[in-house]
Amino acid sequence: MNLPVATALFTPSWHAELELAYARFGDCTRPTRRRHLGPLRVQKHLYAEGPEVCQHIIVHPPGGIAGGDRLDISARVAQGAWAQITSPGAAKWYRAAGPAYQSLNLHVADGATLEWLPQETIVYSAAQAELTTSIELEGDARLFYWDVVALGRPASGERFDLGHFQAHLDIRRDGRLLWHERQRIVGADGLLDSPIGLDGHPVFATLLVTGEIDAELLERCRSLGHEVRGDLTQLPGLLVARCLASEALLARAWLIDLWRLLRPALLGREALPPRIWNT
């Protein structure tokens, strides 16, 4: 039974923190810090691609984020190290009488690589989700970052009619701003159906990867994704890809297809999808 928002939430809020750090020792990347507070954890680090790439899976045992919750996540990748961070499933932001927050701070040192590849974020109608992401790159640090956001639950016939989704994202290299983005989508906003907004698509995705590709590879990337509305833009030192989709699975499949093409070209390694994506 669906209860009114004002009476639905009597559960206590969570304040969770996760602090990660990675360093290179010889030809191996190892985690050097895994501090957690509250219900945020990482599973045992994996080396599916060999010792150079350290993979971590972030888990949030409560299964979702409700009003008053606050998640603070930070990761630092030291010189020469390579970290790949993903998640086992969707992050769910539940309907709430008040806002919930996530702060993400990533720092990638000169010569280091970070792949931030979480699964989708589902924002239920009447949720109040506020996310802030700050990424600092040094020298020739490399970044592969994506996010997928689903508003409402279209498979269940739930539109995003109440609440809001707010996201701030800044990327800097040596203190210089590379990317600055502010999003705020309010339930039942006209932009949800407007041709200059989401045009009726409940799902949108963004990919940001450092580096530049040639025109031939750019066209190959643009030829992907017949089930989504997607495109790419090459900026100086940063490739941007965006799509609109009817389902999160379609958007995520498009991102993975791009990753398969772009990872060898920009990071010098073939793309090996984490096994957790198949579970």
From Swiss-Prot:
Pfam family, one: UreD
Location of the protein in the cell: Cytoplasm
One GO molecular-function entry: nickel cation binding
Entry keywords, A to Z: Chaperone, Cytoplasm, Nickel insertion
Protein purpose: Required for maturation of urease via the functional incorporation of the urease nickel metallocenter.
Subunit relationships: UreD, UreF and UreG form a complex that acts as a GTP-hydrolysis-dependent molecular chaperone, activating the urease apoprotein by helping to assemble the nickel containing metallocenter of UreC. The UreE protein probably delivers the nickel.
Family: Belongs to the UreD family.
Name of the protein in question: Urease accessory protein UreD
Organism (species): Pseudomonas fluorescens (strain Pf0-1)
